[in-house]
Regions:
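Residue register of alpha-helical TPR repeats
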Residues: 48, 88, 108, 128, ...
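C-terminal non-catalytic interaction modules
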Residues: 1-25, 32, 280-371
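Structural signature of alpha-solenoid helical repeat junctions
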Residues: 45, 65, 85, 125, ...
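TPR/TPR-like alpha-solenoid signature
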Residues: 10-12, 31, 51, 91, ...
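Short coil/turn linkers that connect adjacent helices within long alpha-helical scaffolds
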Residues: 20, 38-42, 59, 76-82, ...
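Single-residue signature of alpha-solenoid repeat helices
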Residues: 26, 66, 106, 146, ...
Length: 371
């Protein structure tokens, strides 16, 4: 039995906010309470309200404001000597770094957050930090390094009946199964995540899980309409809650469904829209994936092969710079499918992986970390 989803990142005077609170409401109330805490001279309360402000800005795609807010939250927490609040602020900064495509910085910050949380005896912050490190490695494609950590965090979340992190872990493991071709396992886990999220009233987690189910139905070659219907259901949630990043990824996935169904003109339109959304929030991973879909769609619509080849080379270099190994493999696959051979120096560069090493914190035993 799972409890209702909670939002431990909303703390202090904002503790009554829920996981489904609109981001505009979180930002407005967080800003108001931050001013009140500043008037009262409470640095720890300023740090906790600042955390909510930082997270609202980040989830709305306002990355510069989010960057300023998490750093201010950290400074206030440090001034108050509140190590746990310092951990939460750095966790927010690490999550923002991952969103912006700086995976090395994300690893460093999330590792620091985990250490601070341990020092401050904040087991929830430590759990979130370890989960963030696991997600960063998964997004990068380093499944061997983070697969066990995902499984351990899932087991802990199930044991406690903690819905939000059960959903997160299920979706992460499902994505790894999906990317390694184990579609049946992935589909079962995405569907379980969707059901748990629905029952726990975790609307954000539900929207992401529906997107995962739609992806599997589409990639297996099923009728595209059920996948499109699921994406429409998820989109309604994203729009109602103003989940900017989730909405952009929803649109990119709709492009994927159209592309796999051979509906290249519709796919192009969705990829172009998603590309603009990701650029507007400075999210390079989503931007790169949308660019890849757009290049492939245009190629099928008759674009000049030389231009396609040039675009894929540039995209591959960008993905290599960011360190997104799985996405880079997708470019290699596109080059083969479209008859565009990679240059010799590209193949040679594969011998030198450019992804950051997993910090020691990610290999630590997480038992009890999210209790």
């Amino acid at each position: 039995m799972y409890s209702k989803a909670s939002a431990p990142e909303y703390q202090g005077a904002l503790g009554s906010l829920s996981v489904n609170s609109s981001l505009e409401d979180v930002l407005a109330r967080g800003t108001e309470q931050l001013r009140a805490a500043r008037r009262e001279g409470s640095r720890e309360e300023m740090a906790r309200c600042g955390l909510a402000v930082a997270e609202a800005h980040r989830r709305l795609g306002q990355v510069e404001e989010a960057d300023q807010a998490w750093k201010a939250s950290y400074r206030d927490a440090r001034a108050a000597g509140a190590t746990g609040a310092m951990a939460w602020a750095v966790w927010s900064g690490g999550t923002l770094a991952r969103q912006r495509g700086d995976l090395r910085l994300a690893f460093r910050l999330l590792g620091l957050a985990a250490r601070l949380a341990k020092e401050g005896d904040d087991v929830v912050a430590r759990g979130y930090s370890l989960a963030g490190m696991a997600e960063t490695g998964r997004i990068q494609g380093d499944y061997q390094a983070v697969g066990e950590l995902h499984e351990q965090l899932l087991a802990e979340a199930r044991k406690r009946g903690e819905a939000r992190h059960t959903v997160w872990a299920l979706e992460g493991i499902a994505q790894m199964h999906r990317n390694t071709g184990e579609y049946d396992k992935a589909l079962a886990m995405f569907r379980e995540a969707a059901q748990i999220a629905r029952d726990a009233d975790d609307r954000r987690g539900h929207a992401w899980a529906l997107r995962g189910v739609a992806d599997i139905l589409s990639v297996r070659g099923d009728d595209p309409q059920p996948a499109l219907d699921l994406l429409s259901e998820a989109e309604a949630i994203c729009r109602e809650m103003n989940l900017t990043s989730a909405l952009a990824y929803n649109h990119k996935m709709r492009g994927n469904v159209f592309f796999r169904a051979g509906r290249y003109e519709e796919a192009r339109g969705m990829y172009e829209g998603a590309l603009g959304q990701f650029r507007g929030m400075s999210e390079p991973r989503g931007e790169a994936l949308s660019r890849l879909g757009l290049v492939k769609s245009l190629a099928h619509l008759g674009r000049d092969p030389e231009q396609t080849a040039a675009d894929l080379r540039a995209l591959r270099a960008e993905l290599d710079r960011i360190g997104l190994r799985h996405a880079r493999d997708m470019v290699d696959k596109a080059q083969a499918e479209l008859g565009v051979e990679p240059r010799a120096q590209e193949a040679a560069s594969d011998a030198k992986p450019k992804h950051p090493e997993m910090p020691a914190e990610a290999h630590a035993e997480p038992v009890g970390a999210m209790r």
